[in-house]
């Protein structure tokens, strides 16, 4: 977060704006569309419009509901009928099944597409699933693609996905095309580097720059976005804004009809001054304006180039952290191939503890609980997290329980990261001693799978 965005959110709350309709929402709805249009133009969508909402899960819900309405227009009035499925990347967010259930599609009708060893949706697997669905008489409403996840920055090659889909549609002479949505609530900030933005960052032009190489790879994976229908944005993740502040951004305004009740169609009159009514297409009627104003201030204050420089510095922070891990040789980085700025690492516990028939998984969870208890009592201690069932190099046969550190501050130095790692290492020794003395028991509670 930055003070200007926090101040903007507080100001909107102080004015107590409800962005339900333009007649009494002031210009909040206009600002909302200015934000969506700005974001859309970063990927070449000159007619982009969108919806400010509360969290990435809602952006996915808007996308899937739009897809269902586009495929099955009568479903807006008559409900869902027939055999319909949505696809989602295996490495994508876990909430898609829940959304399918909430929208009446059914969680069993969310099919996960296996990933390759790069963490991307496998094109061959996608084609096989499309063929299977078609053979079973099912229609594919939407394909939800990962646009950068919290762990491993799983990110599809959008150009390849589009080519696979278009080829299948043409070959089978389908009367429809599956809706393509990019779940880019983390990765959206890299859109600032498209259309020549990367070359405008002087630091990326240094030969052999590892950060620049990752950024180039990310930009290449986003090269097919012109053919997608929508994407998601979380300003509270990588946009320097307070919680919660998300956007569903569509390539055009068709979503306004697709998210309606099926009985109203938008016309040019709806966009005349004072006429826009957001309640016709939003899930909520009570819509605060704090996220809208905060995101607009972020765009005006930092701009496209400023946000691009910010994500570049976060990537540099990752390099500094990785160097500290190698320098201290206390832990082992596991995600060397990630394109993101997060660091997943392994903590080796004392061998005598493992010889007691205690698995690394049990020790890791008990250690994480030990560290959380420290922070809960007010001790100044680094905030890091645990990653159960982590696939090393995206290999389903090589799974462990790992830990996660994500640089969020752009000014941390070598000394800062050395302190962070020393603190974790010192508590590891304390934990092992207490575990031997049976002052710490095994963790019996269930740890959720990684938040993606």
For every predicted segment, state its role:
Residues 2-14, 32-44, 102-103, 134, ...:
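Active-site-adjacent bridging/hinge elements
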Residues 37-66, 111-114:
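Short loop-beta-helix segment that forms the pyridoxal 5′-phosphate
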Residues 65-254:
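Conserved PLP-enzyme active-site core in the AAT-like
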């Amino acid at each position: 977060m930055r003070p200007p965005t926090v101040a903007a959110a507080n100001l909107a709350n102080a004015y107590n704006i409800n962005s339900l309709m333009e007649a009494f929402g002031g210009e909040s709805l206009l600002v909302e569309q200015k934000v969506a249009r700005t974001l859309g133009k970063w990927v070449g969508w000159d007619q982009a419009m969108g919806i400010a909402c509360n969290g990435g899960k809602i952006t996915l819900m808007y996308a899937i509901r739009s897809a269902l309405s586009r495929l099955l227009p009568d479903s807006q009035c008559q409900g869902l009928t027939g055999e319909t499925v949505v696809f989602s990347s295996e490495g994508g967010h876990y909430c898609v099944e829940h959304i399918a259930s909430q929208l009446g599609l059914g969680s069993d009708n969310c099919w996960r597409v296996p990933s390759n060893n790069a963490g991307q949706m496998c094109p061959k697997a996608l084609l096989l699933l499309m063929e299977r669905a078609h053979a079973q008489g099912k229609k594919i409403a939407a394909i939800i693609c990962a646009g950068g996840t919290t762990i491993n920055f799983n990110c599809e090659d959008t150009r390849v996905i589009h080519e696979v889909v278009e080829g299948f549609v043409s070959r089978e002479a389908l009367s429809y095309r599956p809706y393509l949505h990019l779940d880019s609530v983390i990765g959206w900030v890299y859109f600032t580097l498209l259309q020549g933005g990367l070359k405008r960052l002087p630091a990326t032009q240094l030969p052999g720059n590892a950060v620049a190489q990752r950024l180039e790879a990310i930009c290449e994976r986003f090269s097919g976005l012109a053919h997608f229908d929508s994407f998601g944005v979380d300003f509270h993740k990588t946009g320097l804004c307070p919680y919660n502040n998300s956007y569903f951004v569509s390539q055009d305004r068709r979503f306004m009809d697709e998210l309606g009740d099926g009985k109203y169609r938008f016309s040019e009159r709806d966009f005349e001054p004072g006429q826009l009514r957001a309640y016709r297409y939003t899930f909520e009627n009570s819509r605060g304006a704090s996220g809208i104003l905060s995101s607009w201030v972020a765009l005006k204050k930092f701009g496209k180039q400023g946000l691009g420089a910010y994500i570049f510095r976060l990537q540099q922070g990752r390099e500094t952290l990785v160097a500290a891990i190698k320098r201290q040789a206390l832990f082992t980085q596991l995600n060397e191939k990630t394109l993101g700025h997060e660091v997943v690492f392994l903590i080796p516990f004392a061998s005598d503890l493992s010889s007691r028939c205690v698995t690394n998984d049990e020790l890791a969870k008990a250690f994480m609980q030990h560290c959380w208890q420290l922070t809960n009592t007010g001790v100044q201690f680094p905030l890091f997290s645990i990653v159960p069932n982590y696939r090393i190099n995206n290999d389903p046969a090589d799974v462990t329980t790992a830990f996660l550190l994500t640089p969020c501050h752009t000014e941390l130095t070598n000394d800062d990261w050395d302190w962070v790692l020393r603190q974790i290492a010192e508590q590891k020794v304390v934990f092992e001693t207490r575990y031997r003395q049976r002052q710490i028991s095994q963790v019996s509670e269930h740890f959720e799978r990684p938040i993606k």
